[in-house]
Amino acid sequence: MACGEFSLIARYFDRVRSSRLDVETGIGDDCALLNIPEKQTLAISTDTLVAGNHFLPDIDPADLAYKALAVNLSDLAAMGADPAWLTLALTLPEVDEPWLEAFSDSLFALLNYYDMQLIGGDTTRGPLSMTLGIHGYIPAGRALKRSGAKPGDWIYVTGTPGDSAAGLAVLQNRLQVSEETDAHYLIQRHLRPTPRILHGQALRDIASAAIDLSDGLISDLGHIVKASGCGARVDVDALPKSDAMMRHVDDGQALRWALSGGEDYELCFTVPELNRGALDVAIGQLGVPFTCIGQMSADIEGLNFVRDGMPVTFDWKGYDHFATP
C-alpha cells in the first residue's frame, strides 16, 4: 500500500517514547512549543546534507542517519551545549520503506542516547537531501565561542584528525588497507564520528575558545584566529595521528589529511596557561586523547606552522562548498 506523507511521518518519525518535560507540544501540531530552562541560553544550529556532496549516494541509511545527527551534535559540543531537540526536513526521490525503517531506527537510537526529542520537520519528494535543525541550551554566560582566544593561550585538539579523510579514501578505493581492523576503524571514523559532547561541556569554564573540526584544521583553527584577532603558531610535528592511518600512508599524506581532510568532528580549543592543570582533570578521564599542538600569539598574523622549529607553509585549504575546483 502506498505510504503518503502523513502516514510516513506517523509510521517512522512519530515514535512513542518518554517525552522531555521541556517539550509542551511536539510532532502533530503547526509548531513545536518548548519551555526553555531558566538561566539557560538557547543554542541552535542547522545543517543541510545533499547526496553526492555531503555523503555517498549508496550509503547505508543507518549510517546516514547517525552521521547526519552526529555532525549537528558536534556543533553543540563546540559551544559546550546540552542537546535537547531536533527538527528534520527530509527530501526523498521515492518512498522506500526498508530505507526509511533503517534510517529512522538509527536516528532514534542516537536521539535516545542523548535524551533528545524529534519535535517536528517536513517531508517532500525530490533528490535525496535533508536539513537538520538541532537545539540545545547552555548555562547563561558560559558558552564556548570562536572569539575568546588570547595571545599565550595553548591550542589543543581531541582525537586524531585525518582519520575521516582516510576512511573516505578507503570507501572510494583510493587507499588500499589490507588489515581489516584498520580499514574498519578508518571507515567508522568517517561514517560514524563521535560528537565530543562531554568534552565541550567540561570545557565551559576552562577553554577560552573552541570549534569543531568539520572542514579541516587549517580552515577551522583559522576561524578562531580570525574571530579572536590574534595569530596562531602550530607545530606540525605535534599533530596526533592514529596508528591505523599511519600504517598505510606516508607522512606527507597523513599530514595533509590531518590539516585539511575535514569531517573529523573533533574539537579544537584554546586554553589559558592558568587553566592547563584544570584541563587535565576535566577531560583526562573521558577516554579520548587530547594534544597540545601550538599556541596563540600577538607577534604573528594568521595561522602559521613550524616543523623542527622552522617555519613551513602549505598550499592546502579546508573544505569549501563554493570553492572553484
Swiss-Prot record:
Signal peptide: none
Pathway(s) this gene product operates in, as recorded in its UniProt entry: Cofactor biosynthesis; thiamine diphosphate biosynthesis; thiamine diphosphate from thiamine phosphate: step 1/1
Residue numbers binding Mg(2+) 5: D215
Coiled coil: none
TM segment ranges: none
Residues given in the record as Mg(2+) 2 binding sites: D47, D75
Example GO BP: thiamine diphosphate biosynthetic process
Kinase as UniProt keyword: yes
Catalytic activity: thiamine phosphate + ATP = thiamine diphosphate + ADP
Top enzyme class: transferase
Chain residues that bind Mg(2+) 1: T46, D47, D122
Keyword Membrane: no
Pfam families for this protein: AIRS (PF00586), AIRS_C (PF02769)
UniProt keyword terms in alphabetical order: ATP-binding, Kinase, Magnesium, Metal-binding, Nucleotide-binding, Thiamine biosynthesis, Transferase
UniProt binding sites for substrate: H54, E263, Y319
GO MF term (any one): magnesium ion binding
Top-level lineage group: Bacteria
Residues engaged in binding ATP: G121, D122, R146, S214
Binding, Mg(2+) 3: D30, D75, D212
Induction: In contrast to other thiamine biosynthetic genes, thiL is not transcriptionally regulated by thiamine-pyrophosphate. Appears to be constitutively expressed.
InterPro entries (alphabetical): PurM-like_C_dom, PurM-like_C_sf, PurM-like_N, PurM-like_N_sf, ThiL-like
EC number: 2.7.4.16
Binding, Mg(2+) 4: D30, S45, D75
Family, as annotated: Belongs to the thiamine-monophosphate kinase family.
Function of the protein: Catalyzes the ATP-dependent phosphorylation of thiamine-monophosphate (TMP) to form thiamine-pyrophosphate (TPP), the active form of vitamin B1.
Protein name as catalogued: Thiamine-monophosphate kinase
Protein species of origin: Salmonella typhimurium (strain LT2 / SGSC1412 / ATCC 700720)
Lineage: Bacteria, Pseudomonadati, Pseudomonadota, Gammaproteobacteria, Enterobacterales
Underlying gene: thiL
